[in-house]
Design a protein with these regions (language model features):
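Glycine-rich phosphate/pyrophosphate-binding loop regions near the starts of catalytic domains
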Residues: 58-69
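Short Gly/Pro-enriched loop/turn and capping motifs at secondary-structure junctions
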Residues: 251-253
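Conserved mixed alpha/beta catalytic, RNA-binding, or beta-rich assembly cores of soluble enzyme
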Residues: 2-7, 11-12, 17-57, 73, ...
Length: 296
């Protein structure tokens, strides 16, 4: 693989806290709905939780012998209480309500920091919930109308890396969608990595004229503003679309592996004419990583 169409630039990332969980269910459809619903609405940039699907598992790969999905939920910063509060919405409103689902802690390290699930999810049983020991774990059994929902008693909180990214510069809509889908699939083959926005069509910037609504468009990279901005535009010749893939991962090694896998497969597609990344002169993330250093 050659990288002559990759810009020599860096992207910015930052540390974050995450919970890695396993959702199981009786059918692939129920598991996919629970996984995608609970990890939608990436919101870390506005101080809330974002998530992603890491991998789907077959029946023989899960503790209870059912279909499974490994998912991650992330929050920037150190406010564990807020993390638990925000996470509880995802677990209760997107998974508990799906029939016959179950959630396990699926942490990949021995962290001693936990989220206690009884207070934020277990008490959905309104005091009728109880603890059972099944699948080699302590599970909270929550009685519900379609019996019954179970969730592991404690989930470990881990620290990882958020916001790794690359942009793939495209001539056509087909390139945006086809190359992007292939990149997401390649990232899902990397253990410990997720793409919380999947194909992201709206790269943002640290500065904004409207701080009350959070990050706003990175105007100098908007193809529709190229003529209006003139020399201030940073949209290159022949570039009509600039989608972004964002990567969160359990560690820097996994982030780098996922980024390389995504870029490599993207460059194989007709209509992809270059690769760049979100370089904000250090204003967004406190960690910087050179794109070419990772790829070569």
């Amino acid at each position: 693989m050659t990288y002559e169409n990759v810009e020599d630039t860096f992207f910015e990332a930052f540390e974050g806290k995450y919970v890695r969980a396993l959702i199981t269910g009786p059918t692939e459809e129920i598991v996919k709905r629970a996984a995608y619903d609970s990890t939608s609405t990436p919101s870390a940039v506005i101080g809330r939780v974002e998530g992603g699907v890491e991998k789907f598992l077959d029946k023989n790969e899960t503790p209870d012998g059912r279909y499974g999905a490994i998912v991650q939920y992330w929050l920037g910063g150190d406010d564990v209480e807020k993390f638990a509060f925000e996470l509880s919405y995802r677990l209760r409103q997107d998974i508990l309500v799906k029939p016959f689902t179950r959630i396990f802690d699926y942490s990949n390290n021995g962290s001693e920091e936990y989220v206690e699930m009884m207070d934020i999810v277990g008490h959905c049983g309104d005091g009728y919930e109880w603890i059972v020991e099944e699948y080699g774990r302590k599970m909270i059994n929550v009685p519900i109308a379609v019996p019954d929902f179970q969730i592991e008693e404690k989930f470990r909180i881990n620290e990882g890396i958020m916001g790794g990214n690359f942009w793939y510069l495209c001539e056509s809509q087909e390139a945006v969608l086809n190359a992007g889908r292939a990149a997401i699939d390649a990232i899902m083959d990397v253990e410990g990595a997720i793409a919380p926005f999947e194909i992201c069509s709206a790269a943002s910037k640290p500065e904004t004229n409207y701080p009350e609504i959070g990050p706003t468009t990175n105007h100098v990279y908007c193809p529709s503003l190229k003529e209006k901005l003139g020399n201030d535009s940073k949209v290159g010749e022949g570039v009509n679309y600039i989608p972004e893939i964002v990567i969160n991962a359990v560690d820097v090694e996994s982030m780098n592996k996922a980024l390389k896998s995504g870029v490599d497969v993207t460059l194989d597609f007709e209509g992809v004419i270059g690769i760049s990344a979100g370089n904000y002169d250090g204003k967004l993330g406190d960690k910087t990583y050179n794109l070419l250093d990772i790829l070569k």
